[in-house]
């Protein structure tokens, strides 16, 4: 059971104007802990598909994690609410070209089709905005290391500046 002082202190913390970076949560054992941003590049398997070609799973990366978001009463206008919505997003890209086998290719057409794909280079918490749907969808998490298997597929592309 929380003391009245702690409840008042927590309430005052959330009503202060400005950005809340950490939110306190009660754990099952009765203690408290603070959650913070946890957004990182994570190895995944992407399945590349093209009509008439055999889908091909490849090792790739995705931005996975959580970022601090909140809504609170405005410090200057108590009848208004302040919102901060942060999302785990890419801050740079990797590019790769992969060949897909296309057994249904017509005579004169190539049996292999080169498909380009992208993956995040780095991830960070940024304001949530609409992001274009990617052509590839993470299918499952993998245990690939950052070196070795994955580095053969991807090369550094360009860096997107967020300002």
Curated annotation (Swiss-Prot):
Cysteines joined through disulfide linkages: 39-88, 53-102, 63-123, 67-125, 85-128
Keyword Repressor: no
Listed GO CC annotations: extracellular space
GO molecular function per UniProt: hormone activity; receptor ligand activity
Chief place where the protein resides: secreted
Domain CTCK residue range list: 39-129
Protein localization: Secreted
Keyword Mitochondrion: no
Keywords from the UniProt entry: Disulfide bond, Hormone, Secreted, Signal
Signal sequence annotation: 1-23
Subunit and interaction comment: Heterodimer of burs and pburs.
Function, in words: Final heterodimeric neurohormone released at the end of the molting cycle, involved in the sclerotization (tanning) of the insect cuticle, melanization and wing spreading.
Remaining remarks: The bursicon gene is encoded by two loci: burs124 on chromosome arm 2L contains exons 1, 2 and 4, and burs3 on arm 2R contains exon 3. Exon 3 is trans-spliced into position in the mature transcript. This unusual gene arrangement has existed for at least the 150 million years (MY) of mosquito evolution since the split of the culicid and anophelid family lineages, but is younger than the 250 MY split of the dipteran suborders Nematocera and Brachycera (containing the Culicidea and Drosophilidae, respectively).
UniProt protein name: Bursicon
Lineage of producing organism: Eukaryota, Metazoa, Ecdysozoa, Arthropoda, Hexapoda
Gene for this chain: burs124
């Amino acid at each position: 059971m929380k003391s009245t002082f702690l409840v008042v202190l927590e309430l005052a913390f959330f009503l202060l104007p400005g950005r809340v970076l950490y939110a306190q949560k009660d754990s099952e054992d009765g203690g408290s802990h603070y959650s913070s941003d946890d957004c990182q590049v994570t190895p995944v398997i992407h399945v590349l598909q093209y009509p008439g070609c055999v889908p091909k799973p490849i090792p790739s990366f995705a931005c996975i994690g959580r970022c601090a978001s909140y809504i609170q009463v405005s410090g200057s206008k108590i009848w208004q609410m302040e919102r901060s919505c942060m999302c785990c997003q890419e801050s740079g890209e990797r590019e790769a070209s992969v060949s897909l086998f296309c057994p249904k290719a017509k005579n004169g057409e190539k049996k292999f089709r080169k498909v380009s794909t992208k993956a995040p280079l780095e991830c960070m918490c940024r304001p949530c905005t609409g992001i274009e749907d990617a052509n590839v969808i993470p299918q499952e998490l993998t245990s690939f290391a950052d070196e070795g298997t994955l580095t053969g597929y991807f090369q550094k592309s360009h860096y997107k500046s967020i300002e």
